[in-house]
Amino acid sequence: SFSGAAMMSPTAKAGLYKVRITKGSEVFEKQIEVKYDPNSMITQAERDQQHKVTMELFDFIEELAYLVYQVDTWDKNVEEHVSSQPKPSKNTQALAAALDGLREKLVVTSGDNYVGAGEPRLREKLNDIYMVIGGYPGAPSSSQLETVQALKKEFQDHQKTWASLQSGELKKFTAELAKANRPPAVIKPKEVFLKES
């Protein structure tokens, strides 16, 4: 799922833009020009770097949201199957534990995400750096860029864990569902998920 930071879209670069407003059956269009402050000490190169990194982080947030969605969808499928079985298989139990473990590394799963929440997970750390870099028009600092790289590395590790689950326990679980004549989880394509989120 998306969080508050993902609702802050990257700022528009300087240039001409067409604005379209629809009110009932009426459509109003106007062209506007976005300009940078001519008195700003921030150079174009710094703005370009900020925009590039902000867009990378925005895409990163979408990738993470899609992974969390897949984990949640399969976890619900596992829970439904377990509730219909007198005794879940060892593989299903292992899969349930692995999905919960992966989710706990991706997002805060305790508290209300505002007060008394658990220690920040990948999503919360990513949101923080996105808000900081995206909220300042100048180039990110070297320490901020190091943080971004560390978060990317962490996400790659979680993606490897997910790929391993898909080819291992999840594949066996799907076969188990087929034997029980139960449908597997239906995962929306990423483009559909992002459009609906």
Language-model region placement:
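A glycine-anchored, Pro-Gly-centered beta-turn/N-cap motif
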Residues: M8-L16, E26
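Mature extracytoplasmic or organellar-lumen-exposed domains after removal of signal/transit peptides
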Residues: L16, K23, K30-I32, E63-S197
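Generic detector of short alpha-helix boundary/capping microenvironments
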Residues: A5, K13, Y36-P38, E169
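Glycine-centered tight-turn motifs at strand-turn-strand junctions
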Residues: S1-M8
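Low-complexity, Pro/Ser/Thr- and charge-rich linker/hinge segments at domain boundaries
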Residues: E29-E63
